[in-house]
Swiss-Prot record:
Amino-acid positions noted as binding FAD in the UniProt annotation, renumbered to this chain: E40, K41, A42, V43, L44, G45, G46, V47, C48, K57, A120, D317, A325
GO molecular function per UniProt: dihydrolipoyl dehydrogenase (NADH) activity; flavin adenine dinucleotide binding
Cofactor(s) of this protein: FAD
Lineage: Bacteria, Pseudomonadati, Chlorobiota, Chlorobiia, Chlorobiales
Cysteine-cysteine disulfides: C48-C53
Additional information: The active site is a redox-active disulfide bond.
InterPro entries: Class-I_Pyr_Nuc-Dis_Oxidored (IPR050151), FAD/NAD-bd_sf (IPR036188), FAD/NAD-binding_dom (IPR023753), FAD/NAD-linked_Rdtase_dimer_sf (IPR016156), Lipoamide_DH (IPR006258), Pyr_nuc-diS_OxRdtase (IPR001100), Pyr_nucl-diS_OxRdtase_dimer (IPR004099), Pyr_OxRdtase_I_AS (IPR012999)
E.C. designation(s): 1.8.1.4
Function, in words: Lipoamide dehydrogenase is a component of the alpha-ketoacid dehydrogenase complexes.
Location(s) in or outside the cell: Cytoplasm
Keyword field contains Oxidoreductase: yes
Gene designation: lpd
Residues that coordinate or bind NAD(+): G186, G187, G188, A189, I190, E209, A275, V276, G277, V278
UniProt remark on cofactor binding: Binds 1 FAD per subunit.
Protein name: Dihydrolipoyl dehydrogenase
Amino acid sequence: MQQADTLAAQFDVAVIGSGPGGYEAAIHAARYGLKTCIVEKAVLGGVCVNWGCIPTKALLRSAEVFDLAKNPETFGVNVGNVSFDLAQAVKRSRNVALKSSKGVAYLLKKAAVEVLAGEAVLTGGAGVMVTMPDGSVRMLGAKNIIVATGSTPRVIPGLEPDGKKIITSREALILKEVPKSMIVVGGGAIGVEMAWFYAKAGSKVTIVELMPRMLPAEEAEVSEALKRSFEKAGITVHCGAKLDNVAVSESGVSAELVVEGSAPQTLNASCLLVAVGVTGAIDGLGLDAVGVETERGFIRTDGQCRTSAPGIYAIGDVRGGMLLAHKASAEAAIAVEAIAGKSPEPLSEPLIPRCVYAQPSVASVGLTEEAAVNAGYQVAVGRSQFAASGKANAYGQLEGFVKLVFDAATGKMLGGHLIGHDAVELIGELGLACRYGVTAGGLVNTVHAHPTLSETVREAAFDALQSMG
């Protein structure tokens, strides 16, 4: 372990940031018997628990229930007129987030991790200066420091958020009323989820995505299926498009929609949500002073999360790559194992599952068909439709499919891609299959309970197996 140069080491490990990566790292370090502290300038749990993953999913659940309640007669249920109460949905969402944050506090206390409320700055000599809420300063010494400060929304010139008419996902989580109309700039995970939520809540939503398709990193067939589903739900989607001349007025926002090959048109909406990605939360940390190198707004690290400065590690969004909570948690274990003198295996990004929680939901892991072909594989592809699933029919959720990509030479699975009701709940099996090279035959020969949506995975594997002879 790196020894402190100028400060008596008060801690073996100091973690900056308490999101999924930070609190997992602190707890993991404590389990090794390392004296550990965690510094958080806002609320325990970080963005994920308080302003990201958790409250977003709570809001999406409210929209799902409302959507189902609008057509209950199909299921033999009569409820009369239904309406959407955004204030109550937001209240429930905030309560869910609060409960999760309290859960993080409990876990840290149970692990005997010292929690410090304040803003941390790296000072050199293995030091951390923490400015407390009352303005007092506490100097810490640590043999090892893990930076887990997460990310902040990326700001695009001309689309600077004002918190009212031009908003980020944070404001979108706590709006006081459903806007009559909304422009969502960005067709990635955040944009897709927020667009679906507000469309179901009653807003007229338009998505503007610069890339040729929504969710551009996903399987093209999945992206196109999602676009069709959104358009069927009344969401307007413009891909290969951008906004110019954005103007804010008392009544809302206007902008010029520019699509290559088409004449510009004017868009008007009550508000505009900017969801164009994030950048690492590195400002004010003092990285330059301690020799931590950054690149394109993120901290540079090796495969074991070591930065360019001895004894300093970085995990999660601030490290770059896939910006996912479960990636941060996995990196937390890697960093702590490295600190403990182990030789942890670096994380393989293609094996990290990716999920988008609109309905239909999208989930994927491993290589797309195109990526597998480009990597030199001779591929075999298997498909199955949710419409053929007994469980999907029973639930009235027929939309969606499973696409599995295999190495035709070995039969081993290379990637899995799904869209459909609760598709995100099926990705664990596919992640396991990709991680350990399970073959199409192995999936087929595994008994899948009936009736479950997981049978769609087996059917897709069977389809691929037949194509392999």
